[in-house]
Amino acid sequence: MYQKEISPSKQYIIKINRGEEILTTLTKFCQDNQIFSGSLLGIGAAGEIDLAHYSVATKQYSKQTFTGEHEVTSLTGIITDKKIHIHATIANNQFQTFAGHLNRMVISGACEIHLLAGAESIGRLLDDETGLELLAL
């Protein structure tokens, strides 16, 4: 285990509008506000969602696209200087849930985010063993 203590800087409550793509919107927000570390939580509703699942064994992602109305029951993410890494859980109108790494999500109703920004910058480094860009602590 590795850890790094960071000081909280600011907290934001963010409303992402209908038709906006969440990663694009949050990336711009973080760039505009010079946020290079932090975490986020959120909920909402989306109509276009691309999720992925990573296999450590093959070092490849499998991907699936979901369309139509879906509740976004959970968004959790880590913000670093290189990217925003979010995992999402969504539910369809049959109450089936799907979860994974978020590649794309277009909001269809609303999206509400609580973002906790860190005062320091956190980076990522490629880990050869897993094939993932992991936190550089």
Feature roles, as predicted:
Residues 1-85, 89-137:
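N-terminal intrinsically disordered, cationic/polar leader segments
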